[in-house]
Amino acid sequence: MQTFNIAVLSGDGIGPEIIAEAIKVLDVVQQKYAFKLNYRTFDVGGIAIDNHGTPLPEATLKGCEESDAILFGSVGGPKWEHLPPAQQPERGALLPLRKHFALFCNLRPATLYKGLEKFCPLRADISAKGFDMVTVRELTGGIYFGQPKGREGEGANEKAFDTEVYHRYEIERIARVAFETAMKRSKHVTSVDKANVLISSVLWREVVCDVAKDYPEVTLDHIYIDNATMQLIKQPEFFDVLLCSNIFGDIISDECAMITGSMGMLPSASLNEKGFGLYEPAGGSAPDIAGKGIANPIAQILSAAMMLRHSFNLNDAATAIENAVKNVLAEGHRTADLADESQPLSTKQMGDLIAQAVE
């Protein structure tokens, strides 16, 4: 029997509540599909600051190193906002984890599920068509990490600067992820750049075109970032796989999230070249609803499904979870973020229904 070790980092806010439901669903799936998951829990984020004085303790990092994947909840909250930026939960935990494990690729699916069209902020005739896309975002290069960056001078001559840097190998490896992802979907990649202005985007487009030659079955088109943000509003159904640099992917993936109607529905995966990944919901720690038992656990549950698919190659088990979510939603069950006039389900009730729906 295949056995996998998972580092469970519940974190802060709603993290522990939604992680509990993801594990509940994983426990059902591992019994039905004959594999074994070993969980080890570690502090991260604000709770780690409270208990250990740092958002990413050595024991947590070591536990992650000894695991096959990281199932991550959420970090942060008002309690720790007074700390220096580098010591705050988000910057002091997530960014070091991404760097330590060389998590260069972020996958963010965005799907408008049947029955949830009315929660989409787009016009009814657009949302009625539905959409199912994934953003493939380069995560470790680009303007967020390029050097030099800084501030200097004073008075009217004071200036600040950042540098957008991309190497050919960085673009090539993220492009290959996008094309491989498209091969398992609708075979369509849209590469987002600003090649009419930025030299880094000129190289980006050249390398993407080179990689595309290895995938003749995949349709490739290019779109400028400004036009991409417009077309996502006008015709989201056109897109399948969106390939983006770090900063453009940051923008696009959040726009995709917004048009689905709820951040509580959106999973994500951050992967390295060896298939090791950190899996987390796209939303934040939501301290305003933490402890109330009303958070939507679906994003966390779907993140667990992504873990089974991308790190463990358990595609059937992952699909079983995704189908369970679709079926529960199709039956009209909703948590508070998606409730209309019906009585909303609690976090636990939604987790129970999805676990029961796994086939």
UniProtKB/Swiss-Prot annotation:
Positions of the record's site feature: Important for catalysis: Y144, K194
MF GO annotations: 3-isopropylmalate dehydrogenase activity; magnesium ion binding; NAD binding
Residues forming coiled coils: none
Claim: Amino-acid biosynthesis is one of the keywords in the record: yes
Family annotation (PROSITE patterns): IDH_IMDH (PS00470)
Keyword Glycoprotein: no
Compartmental location: Cytoplasm
Free-text comment on the cofactor: Binds 1 Mg(2+) or Mn(2+) ion per subunit.
One example of a Gene Ontology biological process annotation: L-leucine biosynthetic process
Cofactors named for this entry: Mg(2+); Mn(2+)
Name of a matching Pfam family: Iso_dh
GO CC annotation, single: cytosol
EC number, as in UniProt: 1.1.1.85
Gene3D superfamilies: Isopropylmalate Dehydrogenase
Catalytic activity: (2R,3S)-3-isopropylmalate + NAD(+) = 4-methyl-2-oxopentanoate + CO2 + NADH
UniProt pathway: Amino-acid biosynthesis; L-leucine biosynthesis; L-leucine from 3-methyl-2-oxobutanoate: step 3/4
UniProt binding sites for substrate: R98, R108, R137, D226
Positions that bind NAD(+): 77-90, 284-296
Protein family: Belongs to the isocitrate and isopropylmalate dehydrogenases family. LeuB type 1 subfamily.
PANTHER family associated with the record: 3-ISOPROPYLMALATE DEHYDROGENASE (PTHR42979:SF1)
Purpose: Catalyzes the oxidation of 3-carboxy-2-hydroxy-4-methylpentanoate (3-isopropylmalate) to 3-carboxy-4-methyl-2-oxopentanoate. The product decarboxylates to 4-methyl-2 oxopentanoate.
Protein name stated in the entry: 3-isopropylmalate dehydrogenase
Species assigned in the record: Pasteurella multocida (strain Pm70)
The encoding gene: leuB
